[in-house]
Design a protein with these regions (language model features):
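Glycine-rich, flexible N-terminal cofactor/catalytic loop recognition
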Residues: 1-67
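Class I SAM-dependent methyltransferase SAM-binding "motif I" and its flanking Rossmann-like core
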Residues: 7, 106-164
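A glycine-rich beta-strand to alpha-helix segment
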Residues: 82-132, 176-180
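Acidic beta-strand-to-loop metal/phosphate-binding motif
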Residues: 39-40, 90-96, 168-172
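A contiguous loop/helix-start segment that scaffolds small-molecule binding in enzyme catalytic cores
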Residues: 2-7, 84-88, 166-233
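Short glycine-rich anion-binding loops that position phosphate/pyrophosphate groups of nucleotides
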Residues: 13-16, 94-98, 174-176, 201-203
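Conserved helicase motor
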Residues: 65-72, 146-150
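Short active-site oxyanion
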Residues: 32-38, 115-119, 167-168
């Protein structure tokens, strides 16, 4: 018996209410329509996404496996066994590309261990969209995920990153945007560092700007509570 394939399915990165099919390549819809088993970070939002790209999608005939930070090993084993038994499985994050700062990473690792073919599909990645529009170093960069929640640890992490090591990329929970921004402005060297703030990418409130720290210190910038990528070099 041939093993199934693990399809990595990107989903829109902007607000769900702003869904626009132009961000979904036609071939992606075609691939999704072939699947009836999914491993997802949020079952409710995944079901809504499937209905939006295809109102006739057979949701009731579809199996959803939840993969989040609380998922136990037994559930991952169930998904891998499903693939070994010849079923294709689609992986969806709650936003953007699965496998990057996302529980899909563990599933991919397990699939490689079992020699299961992984098929990454093309779609929106907030990290790459932010970097490509930042004007900062796109040749050498590091994605750090989230900065520490505690202020002291966050400041220590910011100061630790040397300016000659390329671009440093962070994501943040929207309600902490302002705290992170304030710490960056106060602790990055104003004469040599630049900061890009990319907010609500592909959404109606999209905002992308890159300025020197010295310039930003002269502005009273208040960040709204939208998904945001921070990049500095």
């Amino acid at each position: 018996m041939n093993k199934g394939k693990l399809y990595l399915i990107p989903v829109p990165i902007h607000n769900e209410e702003e869904f626009n099919s132009k961000f979904i390549p036609p071939y992606l819809t075609e691939e999704i329509n072939k699947l009836n088993v999914f491993a997802v970070e949020n079952i409710r939002t995944s079901r809504r996404f499937l209905r939006k790209i295809n109102p006739k999608f057979k949701i009731n005939d579809t199996t959803f496996h939840l993969i989040d930070k609380r998922t136990e090993e037994a559930e991952y084993s169930n998904i891998i066994n499903c693939l070994i038994n010849g079923n294709d499985v689609g992986v969806m994050s709650e936003s953007g590309c699965p496998g990057i700062a996302d529980p899909g990473q563990k599933l991919c690792s397990l699939a490689h261990h079992k020699n299961i073919l992984i098929k990454p599909l093309i779609g929106p990645s907030s990290i790459l969209l932010a970097l490509m529009s930042s004007g900062l170093n796109g040749q050498k960069f590091t994605f750090h995920g989230y900065l520490p929640i505690e202020k002291e640890k966050r400041i220590k992490a910011i100061k630790k990153l040397h300016p000659n090591t390329g671009s440093h990329i962070f994501i943040e929970t929207p309600y902490r945007n302002q705290k992170v921004y304030d710490d960056l402005i106060q602790n990055l060297k104003p004469d040599i560092r630049k900061l890009c703030i990319a907010t609500d990418l592909t959404g109606i409130n999209e905002s992308i700007f890159t300025k020197k720290i010295s310039e930003l210190k002269q502005s009273n910038i208040i960040l709204k509570k939208y998904p945001t990528i921070f990049i500095f070099e």
